[in-house]
Amino acid sequence: MVRMRRVVLCAVLCALAGAGTAMSATLRLSLPPVFEALPVAFAEAWGLFDAEGISVELVGITDNQERSTALLTGNLDAVMGDVSRSLLDCSAGRDLVITGTAISTPQTDSVPLGLLSHIGFGAETLAALLTTNQKIGVSYRTDDEYMLDQLLIANGVTQGWSMRYMYFNDALQLAVWFAAETVPVAVLREPYISYIATYHPPNAAPPDLAWLSTFTGVRSLPSAVVFRKAFVRDHADIVEAFYRACAAAVERINATPREELVEVGLDVVLGLFFQGANVAGVPQDALDAISIPHFEAPAPLSEETFAEVVSWMQKKGYLYDRLEYAAVVDNRFLP
């Protein structure tokens, strides 16, 4: 009888220990340098994860390939990335699952994605670009490449366009190369566009940029959040709390004046988009040019978006295995 009590007591203690560890585990998450990641970064800065009783470690990696490798090797528990990269990761490691998406809507005076060139160095119109052999800098196997493909197809370029691409795995590196006029034409996102357009050395004029396209008519895609299935299985409560904190951050960001966001969250923005940058070294003109978008609450990845991107990736030869929506998407944890 005494022995039975000990067995039961041991089982209860083990169960309690397991319950305590579930919320005490640290979620190791890497964010890409895109606006959709800001709610996660602000949730950490504002203590919203702490308020939910979870520990989140944000790991700064701007290189897509390095971020994917860290996730696939178990050095990260989750990453935020674009849909194309997320599906590519899921195809490479069957123990990954997309648990939600982050969506932002640009303000009326801003453009989230642009095809740009330097006047006098690159083509000055899209029509002129299509008649040249100039290289186009773009992030490799990403939604930016997907949207560039759709843009060129809509303008009658159906063959040979991939030979024109100069691929990058790091969005920050692409922005730096374009700013230095090493790449004549590039697909860039905000806030890199505003930064490049306004930054200039002392006693020099700002760069003269040509907007070849703002991707009007090309449907934009959300950012996706990918978790390791083992983490989801063992710490479902942390995943749910993570999304609650992100939803709270979205509401707070949307209700906070832009000036306050930039002032209070400057370190957050710089840490995400310009790793290692000194606040004092960022020109005020560049900060003033950054337009904070409106954010939407975390949402599921739609089956329509999933099917469109999978089809594109298969045609490009990026996906060889068949991916099923139900196998790589789990929407149970969204608020």
Which sequence ranges carry the predicted segments?
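N-terminal hydrophobic or amphipathic helices and topogenic motifs
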Residues: L16, G20-E57, F306-P335
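Pocket-lining segment of extracytoplasmic ligand-binding domains
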Residues: S84, L172-L272
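Bacterial N-terminal signal peptides that target proteins for export
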Residues: M1-L9
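Short, glycine-/small- and polar/acidic-enriched structural segments
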Residues: T26-G160, R164-Y167, P184-E190, D208-L212, ...
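Short, solvent-exposed loop/beta-turn-alpha elements that line the ligand-binding surface or hinge
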Residues: P106-T108, F121-G122, G217, I292-S302
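Secondary-structure end/capping motifs
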Residues: R233-Y318
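Bacterial N-terminal signal peptides
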Residues: V8-G18
